[in-house]
C-alpha cells in the first residue's frame, strides 16, 4: 500500500509544525501518512506530540527504509536520484513549497515546515488537535498547584498579555532578540490594549529578575525546564494577547489563543532573514539580534 512518511524532530514547537504539515499532506495527497520518530532515539529531545490527541500512526523501521528507498542497493538509489526519481524531499525549514502538498513520487519528508500556509486549509482541525487538555492530576501535584496559581493571576487580569523572551540555546550564537524589540512591541500594544497586564515567560530566571521593560509585569519564569513546554504553553494561550519571540514555542501559544480580537505581535526578522512564519493578521515589529554575527544577523 502506498504511504508517505514525515520526520518528527526537535522541540515541542517544531514537532507541532511537522505534525500540522503531515496532516495537511494527508488531506491533499489522499494518502496515508506515517510519522518517523526515530530521531528521539539519539536526541536529547523528547517526543512531546503525545500530549495531544494525534491520530497519525508511527512508521516502523521497515516502512521508513522503504520511504527512503533504503531497501534498494545504493547504486540503484544513486541512479534513480540522478534520473530525477529521488523520493526523499529536500530539507525545508522556513520555505513555503506548495508543490510538496501535491501528489508526487516523494515518499519521505524531512524539515520544519515553518509556514502557516502549509496548513491554512485545515486550521480548525489543527487548533482543535493542539488545544491542550487539562494538566494530568497524577505525579504532578506540585507543578499543578503552581500552574493553577499562575493561571488564576492570568484569568483575573482584564487585559492579559504574555511576553515571551527566548534565551537558552539562543544566547551566544546571535539568535536572541535585543530587548528593544519587546519594548517597541509593548509601546504598540499599550496604545491598543488599555490597562494591559503583562506576564513574562522566559527560561532564564536571573535575566528576568533584572529585566526592565518600561512596564510592570508578573514574572512567570519556569523553574522546571523539563515541564516548561507543556505547562507554560497552557498559560500563554490563556492570555488575551501575546508578544512572541522568534520561537515556534510561543508562536503556537499565540496561534492557539481563542480570543477573536487578539493582538499578536512578532519580530519582523525571525531567523536567517525569514519573515513569512508570522500569520498575515499578526503585527510585525522591527527587530535585531542581540549578538552580531554574519551568519545569524538579519
Enumerate the language-model features and the residues they cover.
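Extreme N-terminal starter segment of soluble prokaryotic enzymes
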Residues: 1-5
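Donor-binding and catalytic core of enzymes assembling or modifying cell-surface/extracellular glycoconjugates
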Residues: 12, 190-277, 282
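Leloir-type glycosyltransferase catalytic cores
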Residues: 272-298
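A short beta-strand-loop structural module common to alpha/beta enzyme folds
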Residues: 31-42
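A short, glycine/small-residue-rich beta-strand->loop->alpha-helix junction that serves as a flexible
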Residues: 7-17, 174
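Short amphipathic alpha-helix
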Residues: 18-25
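Secretory-pathway luminal glycosyltransferase catalytic domains
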Residues: 43-193, 298
